[in-house]
Amino acid sequence: GKMGNPVGHSGPREQKQVGMKKIEAIIKPFKLDEVKEALHDVGVMGLTVTEAKGFGRQKGHTELYRGAEYVVDFLPKVKIEVVLDDDQVDGAIEAIVQAAKTDKIGDGKIFVSPIEQSIRIRTGETGSDAL
């Protein structure tokens, strides 16, 4: 739910410009449930999950195929995307880090970027109301 704001009530058409951010987290697939729970615990309800493959500094393993060695670079990852009000960002990042960390290479990355607008298609609500 939304916390009531102490300042006067603004009508639906007046954009109350609360800043929004998108958090993208690339994590190990087996950590997805833990991360989802952790985000839920800090009040994040909506998220998008995409299966991904990636490689960073983690070097792939080698496989033998028809007598030749190949390096398999891409490792399965999961990408989680969440759009939040600015004031929820730090809590969400902390939740993701705590839940996704194994202290091993390949734990993943988190990227934060500004969101200019959000619209709920069904109702036409915009901004924070659309999250």
Q: What are the language-model segments listed below?
A:
Residues 2-131:
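Positively charged, small/polar-rich N-terminal and surface patches that mediate targeting and assembly
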